[in-house]
């Protein structure tokens, strides 16, 4: 049975973060925080910018993210999920410091051929899983406003853009130029023009489809999924991605209240 928080008169919104650095800014502003530990995860209930929320870390990888998402729906009764994180840029024109708001997700490491076409999820009859259009549009608008804000523009990414499109997920950190090229070309050959690559989103998308829960995802591009990815990643998350997540979610929740 879902746990309905006494802090919230309406169903809470889940705000998922991929990494602790991204969650810190949100935690600092959480009003009436209340921690519940479930499934070896800490879930923080409270209010943020006028909205009842549950904050959680997805943990890393598809299975971990699916477990967290299921717990949010089953245990806390959330009916909307928003996920912030970082990703490697794959698409042409997608550069470090940009943001990609997902329209769909695909698993780049799923291959049940010859029983099913490569990338197709068995028994679902599809390879791609759609994000909620209305929620994603709000997130796109919030991202655009946040990136235009002086405090972010002055952080060295004044030319940062917001993109919309397909993101690929898989259980490996793509960090080589050759690996990145092979992945991009293979997916394009199957009709999947991917803008970015990460490790959780497709699993969240599949769980949300199963439960009929709307969700939206934004990913800050931390690297180009090439040979420098492992070097760029830690510094970028600490210095930039955490500020992006905080600023974008703030604007998103304010827009939702209006």
Q: Could you describe each region identified by the protein language model?
A:
Residues 90-191:
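Mid-sequence, gly/pro-rich, charge-dense loop/helix-turn segments that line enzyme active sites
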Residues 54-59, 166-168, 218:
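Active-site-proximal beta-strand elements of phosphoester/diester hydrolases
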Residues 78-82:
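Proline-aspartate-enriched helix->loop->beta-strand connector
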Residues 39-41, 60, 104-107, 221-223:
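Short, acidic/turn-prone active-site loops that include or flank metal/cofactor-
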Residues 2-70, 76:
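N-terminal short beta-loop-beta anion/metal-coordinating cradle
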Residues 170-226, 230:
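A C-terminal functional module that forms or caps the active site or interfaces directly
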Residues 225-258:
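His/Asp/Glu-rich mid-to-C-terminal helical/loop segments that flank catalytic regions of hydrolases
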């Amino acid at each position: 049975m879902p746990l309905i928080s006494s802090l919230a008169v309406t169903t809470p919104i889940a705000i998922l973060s991929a990494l602790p650095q991204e969650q810190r800014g949100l935690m600092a502003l959480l009003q009436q925080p209340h921690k519940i530990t479930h499934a070896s995860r800490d879930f923080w209930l409270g209010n943020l910018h006028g909205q009842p929320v549950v904050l959680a870390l997805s943990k890393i990888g598809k299975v971990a993210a699916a477990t967290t998402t299921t717990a949010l729906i089953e245990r806390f009764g959330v009916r909307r999920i928003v996920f912030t994180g970082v990703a490697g840029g794959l698409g042409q024109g997608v550069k470090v410091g940009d943001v990609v708001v997902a329209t769909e997700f695909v698993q780049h490491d799923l291959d049940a051929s010859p029983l099913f076409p490569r990338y197709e999820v068995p028994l679902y009859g599809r390879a791609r899983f759609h994000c909620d259009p209305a929620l994603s549009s709000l997130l796109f608008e919030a991202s655009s406003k946040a990136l235009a804000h002086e405090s972010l523009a002055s952080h060295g990414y004044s030319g940062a853009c917001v993109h919309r499109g397909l993101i690929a997920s898989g259980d490996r950190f793509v960090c080589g130029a050759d690996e990145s090229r092979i992945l991009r070309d293979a997916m394009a050959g199957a009709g999947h023009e991917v803008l970015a690559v990460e490790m959780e989103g497709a699993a969240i998308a599949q769980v949300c489809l199963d439960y009929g829960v709307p969700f939206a995802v934004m990913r800050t591009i931390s690297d180009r999924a090439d040979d420098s990815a492992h070097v760029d990643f830690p510094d970028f998350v600490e210095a930039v991605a955490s500020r992006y997540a905080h600023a974008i979610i703030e604007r998103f929740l304010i827009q939702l209240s209006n």
